[in-house]
Amino acid sequence: MRCLTKTRSFHYVIIFYSFFFLPFLSSSSDDQRTTVSGLFCGGRSKSSADPNYIPTFVEDMHSLSLKLTTRRFATESLNSTTSIYALIQCHDDLSPSDCQLCYAIARTRIPRCLPSSSARIFLDGCFLRYETYEFYDESVSDASDSFSCSNDTVLDPRFGFQVSETAARVAVRKGGFGVAGENGVHALAQCWESLGKEDCRVCLEKAVKEVKRCVSRREGRAMNTGCYLRYSDHKFYNGDGHHKFHVLFNKGVIVAIVLTTSAFVMLILLATYVIMTKVSKTKQEKRNLGLVSRKFNNSKTKFKYETLEKATDYFSHKKMLGQGGNGTVFLGILPNGKNVAVKRLVFNTRDWVEEFFNEVNLISGIQHKNLVKLLGCSIEGPESLLVYEYVPNKSLDQFLFDESQSKVLNWSQRLNIILGTAEGLAYLHGGSPVRIIHRDIKTSNVLLDDQLNPKIADFGLARCFGLDKTHLSTGIAGTLGYMAPEYVVRGQLTEKADVYSFGVLVLEIACGTRINAFVPETGHLLQRVWNLYTLNRLVEALDPCLKDEFLQVQGSEAEACKVLRVGLLCTQASPSLRPSMEEVIRMLTERDYPIPSPTSPPFLRVSSLTTDLEGSSTISHSTNSTTTFNTMVKTDQASYTSSESSTTRTI
């Protein structure tokens, strides 16, 4: 009974703290760059089970706070039965009070990882990490480094170019810190002060490569072992990026000290709570899981975190299969010997619960040979994990666009991939228990099994709707170049948006060229294929790697041209003119099935088409052709103007 009374009393203290202190922390977090960009928890070890581990951790955090009063960087290590090493780095443009405040927020958030033996947290103004070994000179790590992209999309292609330029420029600044802002793009780069110049350079060069994968989004962040790089379409750093670190006990510093002290109190309370919960899980903890636990509490979908941790060798770098904007995928071997793919999720938005369970809810109950099967998830460990069937080969884009792999796929295999993807989409649109729109069909989301059969993956953006509805109205999300025009302009989502994305995919597979690859003489891929179609020279658009096969296999070249026509049908400007996926399958498989003549895709000015591709100077095209909707063709079937583009463009 005494134990129960203490537990309840402790919960009352936590509640009191939450209502009294947290409003001050959250109210300040909008201006002082204390938004959490990423929290990464390591595995558990014998040292983290030591009774002295959490008290040592609390002492380390307090010592860092004292050191941070005179500078923006500090390290601390306490040697007891369990050694803990910690590092804090504020960005060089932060004032003393903002640095203290950022650390106060970080040290209240990072205990969420306890009792993990390691953790790191990135805020927009500082970085905090602890380990059981000395890590201060580490620069990069393929297993731990991550990046994140915002959800909202920028439609101006010049923005992506400016991001690449600005990020590269800020990364070469000397001294381990730099900011830059030009043409609506602002960037900040920061190395930890414990790194040498060469290690800093290596870390930031990798960071630049990572944020370049976000260039179509308004913001991107690279969160590496030894550095941080962020870009945005608005200025987020202070002044010119430099702030002298004077120790002045002004109002801001006093507020920061008070908040830091309160954070320290919270740490002590939290440490006590962790120790108590290691002995016994209370009923209150189970109720906090609420609907989440009840929904996935059957043995078929629920995995223990410890099982997946061991299956991946504690998320070993050697088991890493790939990395994306919202997590890293590892190969796992279950106790029964079965191979699975374990996705270790990174949540950096307030809507992470919706993002996580959207994918679980939609695909846990559907099965098709051309859809990656979700086997289950883990939600009660220090981080959330998704478990998929293991698909041994890489994604389609690595076969098509990697020069060393581009000749691996012959035409027969490419046609099989196109047909399999079509069958998977047809199942989602009408054959599954609910109608599902994928919203992000692209080459990197089509995986290939050991027989090079396609499997559609990544249902994080998918949406379902009832049979009685004609469309959904929603903010846009997806990948530029693959998104249907009516969806981008009006926010109206139907199955025909997936059909458009599929059409782009077909053109990429048959031509061996990325949709966003721009050639000054011929424009983007969609422009080039359409121009050649109007000139009756469609064969020139096909991948040159297939030329020898077309010469050897009679009829294969004509078949490939037929597939290109189907791709053009799917990318027509008007959704009503695009075929359904069932019709696409019939066009691809039935020799006598009629294939209509396609109308012009969006983004093109039909009157500017020339009768001779070789006279490139007479071809008019817009460099914004795949992303700017104010310059679209006006045809009898579709008209898109700026007056229609008032849709909110975020999820």
Swiss-Prot record:
The modification Phosphothreonine is found at residues 474, 479. Residues 315-604 form the Protein kinase domain. Glycans are attached at residues 79, 151. The active site is at residue 440. Pfam families: Pkinase, Stress-antifung. The chain crosses the membrane at residues 252-272. Gene3D superfamilies: Gnk2 domain, C-X8-C-X2-C motif, Phosphorylase Kinase, domain 1, Transferase(Phosphotransferase) domain 1. PROSITE patterns: GNK2, PROTEIN_KINASE_ATP, PROTEIN_KINASE_DOM, PROTEIN_KINASE_ST. Residues 1-28 form the signal peptide. It catalyses: L-seryl-[protein] + ATP = O-phospho-L-seryl-[protein] + ADP + H(+); L-threonyl-[protein] + ATP = O-phospho-L-threonyl-[protein] + ADP + H(+). Its EC number is 2.7.11.-. InterPro entries: CR_Ser/Thr_kinase, GNK2, GNK2_sf, Kinase-like_dom_sf, Prot_kinase_dom, Protein_kinase_ATP_BS, Ser/Thr_kinase_AS. It is an enzyme of class 2 (transferase). The modification Phosphoserine is found at residues 444, 473. Belongs to the protein kinase superfamily. Ser/Thr protein kinase family. CRK subfamily. This is Cysteine-rich receptor-like protein kinase 42.
